[in-house]
Amino acid sequence: MLGRCFPPDTKEKQQLRMTKLCDPAESELSPFLITLILAVLLAEYLIGIIANGFIMAIHAAEWVQNKAVSTSGRILVFLSVSRIALQSLMMLEITISSTSLSFYSEDAVYYAFKISFIFLNFCSLWFAAWLSFFYFVKIANFSYPLFLKLRWRITGLIPWLLWLSVFISFSHSMFCINICTVYCNNSFPIHSSNSTKKTYLSEINVVGLAFFFNLGIVTPLIMFILTATLLILSLKRHTLHMGSNATGSNDPSMEAHMGAIKAISYFLILYIFNAVALFIYLSNMFDINSLWNNLCQIIMAAYPASHSILLIQDNPGLRRAWKRLQLRLHLYPKEWTL
């Protein structure tokens, strides 16, 4: 999404560069493979929207009914909203770019998609990192004074941290508008032929790109890896302690801890894959229509959907609500026929 094709500039027409587009790059994929990729992407978008919509609806209903929501529920609401918006945006973009390329290539439309994509991705990364951070502070068993003080204040800090992440993501997305531009060269000669071939060249602001990835991707990634790893170590130590005291594996507290670490472990794998795919995709390492670029899109679309499904499976409250919803959907046709 960061790369767009423009014709070579002349000194007289530098001001017109932003509105003169090259023809789309020739696709390296067969029509069947393109159709398959589009079908997979659309399926992932729909699954992600449904799963995150369910999580958001459950916690939003709790928020309205009780006039309050738990700290983890608040984080999940922010995370679900950002993912629903991101999945909807990506689905809308792929639809418009496939059906109306001229409209999609207009400056206002293109940059609206570009800024929104970066903003929502960074929000999702930060919210997920804060979810891992919250689990670490509430579940990990450390006795350091600073850690205990942080645990005592975490409930009041989370709302400020969430809104700070929104501000950072928005500011950063506006800063990164002109990091990378792709130009096309129509005069590259083909040997043993009188024809020319269209090539695509990237112009990248290296300093801006480094700042872009360090603040937007690497920082929340490092925070997530550290908190998840420390949480795993803490729970392992707790497991060994319970085993030595012969408490048993059916301790409710232990089961809750193991359920949380299981969810975090799966989330860690998905988070790393998504961050790497996002890094590659935004770096324009591959051609827009290449298989690798499309693979990155598939991974980025699969991440919100798969993690939301894991959250529903591993969270007792969400799992019960999902079963009740399935039961109602199963009984609804029978009630309608009666």
From Swiss-Prot:
It holds the Pfam family TAS2R. Residues 52-74, 138-156, 227-262, 313-338 are cytoplasmic. The keyword Glycoprotein applies. Its main location: membrane. SUPFAM superfamilies: Family A G protein-coupled receptor-like. Residues 1-30, 96-116, 178-205, 284-291 are extracellular. Glycans are attached at N185, N194. It is a multi-pass membrane protein. GO terms for biological process: detection of chemical stimulus involved in sensory perception of bitter taste. The chain crosses the membrane at residues 31-51, 75-95, 117-137, 157-177, 206-226, 263-283, 292-312. It is found in: Membrane. One of its GO terms (molecular function) is G protein-coupled receptor activity. Keywords: G-protein coupled receptor, Glycoprotein, Membrane, Receptor, Sensory transduction, Taste, Transducer, Transmembrane, Transmembrane helix. The keyword Nucleotide-binding does not apply. GO terms for cellular component: membrane; plasma membrane. It comes from the Eukaryota. Expressed in subsets of taste receptor cells of the tongue and exclusively in gustducin-positive cells. PANTHER family: TASTE RECEPTOR TYPE 2, TASTE RECEPTOR TYPE 2 MEMBER 39. Receptor that may play a role in the perception of bitterness and is gustducin-linked. May play a role in sensing the chemical composition of the gastrointestinal content. The activity of this receptor may stimulate alpha gustducin, mediate PLC-beta-2 activation and lead to the gating of TRPM5. Most taste cells may be activated by a limited number of bitter compounds; individual taste cells can discriminate among bitter stimuli. Belongs to the G-protein coupled receptor T2R family. This is Taste receptor type 2 member 39.
